[in-house]
């Protein structure tokens, strides 16, 4: 890792035995960025290998079970054409297969869950089905090979190039080494940056490095945003679905963070934007017509009413009797885990963090079922049923933890608070890049961190994604394809969201494809006027929006 020191390249000897293969572009990590990168490579006629640690592609949207955090203009502009197609195909899946009410079916902007966090809250399995269908023609044509349940364990470098990556098959322990002229790191934590010795940053930079007002005085690589094991719930009155008491329940029931207004397992929590103590409400299966729900983060964060905040199936959008409960996704302040950093303390540290995060979410569920205060004066909601059938697990938790912050490349261009924070650039300001390869918009949203920081949630402006943020300073053929691009601990807070991750992956895949077709390297594309113009035209043809109209930050 690198905050004060630089990581140097190291060659890793190839392991004996195992499977060996070659492709045009190796994409390690099958989240939204990896999927978008694979589509971009295959659309251009090149071959790709896409790997994924879990057995589900889609990352945030599927295996991590996080409904998309999106900006208020998402239905009009501000995302790539392929991301818009993904959203519309999810809607069409519901229209084709679900017993929607006629008035819901006819909505052009159908929100299947009627959640308040997003204009498109949907079940992880539906998003997975759409992603698999979208990739299917490329797999059938032999352009795309997908290796699920594979994790990178070694990178093989020569000079300033990554020549191959060795992956471990998590099902049987075998090794598979893939050689490729271009390697994309789409992992959730930027794993390849560490394995390949690519110069990178982890955690919080010192304020002096970029003069960011919200950076700490001292750099701290172990100061990272908390992770979350999301879980899916439905509620069935009169039934008892209480789980076994989690092993660490006593600890979490009594846990009081120093910056919290009371116990973490409670309905009183800070407002992320003001840090004032604000009560949350919890009412399973409310009678409010879901057609009356508005999802607009610029007007209302939507997080005060917990059941509807991230609801992914609204029973009242469907014909009477089709579903006896909504399904909601629990990704709340109450189950953010920040006791131990996920990255930077080796495999043992990773295991501790994942175990702690799982125990916290299970403890929250048990508390909800047994001790949570009800509006009628009673305690507990034993009818809460964990929906492992929705998340693809036995316990109802997501397959993987939601990771907000990764290792980040030391990039040719680093996006800092001075490029995006509204109080620094004004409501219509922000840096405009001649090499922009996409756009995004979201508040700078930092969750409580392993360094003891409370929320940092501040206004930002609609921003651009510079090509330079996808280029490592030294390594020539590895590209970031997710939240590991050239941002800071602070600006990661607005560049980590679903549509931005997709855009970064799509741009990285398109860049690798362009370099293969033109016989150039990524840094040449940015440095040479003709190459840059040709590449940007390629993005324009593919429907990648690179600049914003005149819209105000929030």
Identify the meaning behind each predicted range.
Residues 4-5, 14-15, 46-47, 52-150, ...:
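Conserved N-terminal/central alpha/beta ligand/cofactor-binding core
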Residues 19-31:
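Beta1/beta-strand and adjacent pyrophosphate-binding region of the FAD-binding site
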Residues 34:
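N-terminal Rossmann-fold NAD(P) dinucleotide-binding loop
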Residues 41:
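Aromatic pocket-lining residues of Rossmann-like dinucleotide-binding sites
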Residues 156-177:
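Conserved beta-strand-loop-beta-strand element in the redox core of flavoprotein oxidoreductases
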């Amino acid at each position: 890792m690198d905050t004060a020191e630089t990581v140097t390249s190291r060659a890793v000897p190839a392991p004996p035995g195992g499977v060996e293969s070659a492709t045009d572009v190796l994409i390690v990590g099958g989240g939204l960025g990896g999927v978008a990168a694979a589509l971009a490579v295959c659309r251009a006629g090149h071959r790709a290998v896409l790997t994924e640690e879990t057995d589900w592609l889609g990352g945030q949207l599927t295996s991590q079970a996080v409904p998309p955090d999106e900006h208020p203009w998402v239905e009009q502009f501000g995302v790539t054409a392929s991301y818009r197609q993904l959203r519309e195909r999810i809607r069409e899946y519901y229209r084709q297969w679900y017993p929607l009410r006629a008035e819901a079916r006819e909505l052009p902007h159908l929100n299947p869950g009627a959640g308040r966090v997003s204009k498109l809250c949907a079940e992880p399995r539906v998003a997975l089905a759409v992603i698999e269908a979208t990739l299917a023609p490329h797999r059938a044509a032999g352009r795309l090979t997908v290796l699920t349940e594979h994790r990178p364990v070694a990178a093989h470098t020569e000079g300033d190039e990554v020549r191959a990556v060795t992956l471990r098959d998590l099902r049987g322990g075998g090794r598979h080494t893939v050689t490729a002229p271009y390697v994309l790191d789409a992992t959730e934590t930027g794993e390849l940056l560490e394995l390949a010795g690519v110069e990178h940053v982890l955690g919080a930079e010192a304020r002096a490095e970029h003069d960011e007002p919200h950076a700490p005085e001292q750099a701290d690589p172990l100061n990272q945003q908390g992770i979350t094991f999301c879980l899916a719930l439905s509620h069935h009155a009169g039934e008892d679905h209480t789980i076994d008491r989690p092993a660490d329940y006593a600890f979490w029931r009594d846990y009081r963070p120093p910056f919290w207004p009371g116990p973490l397992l409670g309905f009183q929590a800070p407002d992320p934007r003001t840090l004032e103590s604000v009560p949350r409400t919890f009412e399973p299966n409310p009678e409010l017509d879901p057609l009356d729900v508005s999802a607009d983060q610029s007007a209302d964060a939507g997080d005060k009413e917990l059941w509807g905040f991230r609801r992914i199936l609204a029973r009242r959008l469907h014909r009477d009797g089709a579903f006896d409960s909504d399904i909601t996704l629990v990704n709340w302040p109450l189950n953010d885990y920040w006791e131990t950093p996920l990255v930077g303390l080796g495999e043992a540290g990773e295991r501790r963090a994942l175990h702690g995060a799982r125990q916290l979410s299970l403890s929250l569920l048990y508390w909800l079922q047994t001790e949570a205060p009800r509006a009628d004066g009673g305690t507990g909601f034993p009818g809460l049923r964990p929906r492992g059938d929705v998340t693809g697990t036995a316990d109802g938790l997501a397959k993987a933890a939601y990771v907000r912050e990764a290792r980040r490349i030391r990039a040719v261009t680093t996006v800092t608070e001075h490029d995006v924070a509204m109080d620094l650039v004004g409501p219509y300001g922000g840096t405009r890049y001649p090499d922009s390869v996409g756009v995004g918009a979201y508040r700078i949203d930092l969750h409580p961190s392993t360094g003891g920081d409370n929320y940092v949630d501040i206004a930002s402006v609609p921003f651009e994604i510079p090509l330079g943020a996808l280029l490592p300073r030294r390594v020539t053929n590895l590209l970031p394809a997710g939240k590991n691009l050239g941002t800071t601990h602070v600006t990661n807070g607005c560049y980590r969201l679903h549509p931005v991750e997709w855009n970064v992956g799509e741009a990285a895949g398109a860049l690798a494809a362009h370099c293969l077709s033109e016989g150039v390297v990524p840094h040449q594309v940015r440095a040479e006027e003709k190459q840059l113009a040709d590449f940007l035209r390629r993005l324009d043809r593919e429907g990648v929006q690179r600049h914003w109209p005149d819209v105000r930050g929030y």
